[in-house]
Swiss-Prot record:
Source lineage: Bacteria, Bacillati, Bacillota, Bacilli, Bacillales
Disulfides per UniProt: none
Name of the protein this chain belongs to: L-cystine transport system permease protein TcyL
Keywords, sorted A to Z: Amino-acid transport, Cell membrane, Membrane, Transmembrane, Transmembrane helix, Transport
ABC transmembrane type-1 domain boundaries: 21-216
Gene Ontology CC: ATP-binding cassette (ABC) transporter complex; plasma membrane
Induction: More strongly expressed in the presence of methionine than in the presence of sulfate.
PROSITE patterns: ABC_TM1
Length: 239
């Protein structure tokens, strides 16, 4: 039975939940790293309109952007053992942590692919032509000139993706991950103070999100300053 609201319990719950913040951040970090790498590979066929692969990338991105993250969590959590079982490998006792990382990585890849594609599209085509004029190949021009500038343009959206993914990790408890939200569920069961637990959770998540926003805002300003210098030097070398 739910107990009467107690403001003091919020202060007690915050440090208890914060102790599990490293688990949440670990899931977030790994899924962002893997997601960004996969997203880059998904973005390339979209950017260069590679037949068949482009269509497959479109379907992948559409699926992961068009379905709820909780549904994706359950598909991966139950789907991996089902698939590995077909080849005689038993992963039914797999730590749900890995299923959560895999799910968020796959989901982040879809978002990252579109962000990278938009970033590349925002780079002045004259930069690529200038790169060709000094003897760079297509791949060299992309790696050295286009991609760095595209990532700078995409940086604000990347920041939004990180914060969105942070909030999405709050659902990892649904497959048994003991992160902040998972610990919150056990606190609700043991204390019968649901509202206080959710308020405490919101405080911790909000504090982390604000820190991330501040970091990306400061980093964006510094990166844009460096980009201006790099582009200026590149233009001077051409002329």
């Amino acid at each position: 039975m739910e107990k009467a609201f107690d403001m003091n319990m919020i202060g007690d719950f915050v440090p208890t939940l914060t102790a599990y913040l490293p688990v949440t951040l670990y899931i977030l970090t790994l899924s962002l790293l893997f997601g960004f790498v996969l997203g880059l590979f998904l973005a390339l066929p979209r950017i260069y309109n590679i037949p068949i692969v482009n269509q497959l990338a479109k379907v992948y991105i559409s699926f992961f952007r068009g379905t709820p993250i909780m549904v994706q969590l359950f598909i991966v959590f139950y789907g991996i053992p089902a698939l590995t079982g077909l080849i005689g490998i038993d992963t039914s006792k797999m730590d749900p942590f890995y299923a959560a990382v895999a799910t968020y990585a796959l989901s982040n890849a879809a978002a990252a692919a579109e962000i990278i594609r938009a970033g590349v599209g925002s780079v002045d085509k004259g930069q690529t032509e200038a790169a060709y004029s000094i003897g760079l190949s297509g791949s060299q021009a992309f790696r050295r000139i286009v991609l760095p500038q595209a990532l700078v343009q995409a940086f604000p959206n990347m920041g939004n993706m990180v914060i969105s993914s942070l909030k999405d990790t709050s659902l990892a408890f649904s497959i048994g991950v003991m992160d902040m939200s998972g610990r919150g569920q056990t606190l609700i069961t043991s204390s019968n103070h649901s509202l206080e637990v959710y308020i405490a959770l919101s405080i911790v998540y909000y504090a982390v999100a604000v820190l991330f926003e501040w970091f990306f805002r400061v980093a964006e300003k510094r990166i844009k300053k460096n980009q201006t210098r790099i582009v200026t030097v590149f233009d001077m070398n051409i002329h």
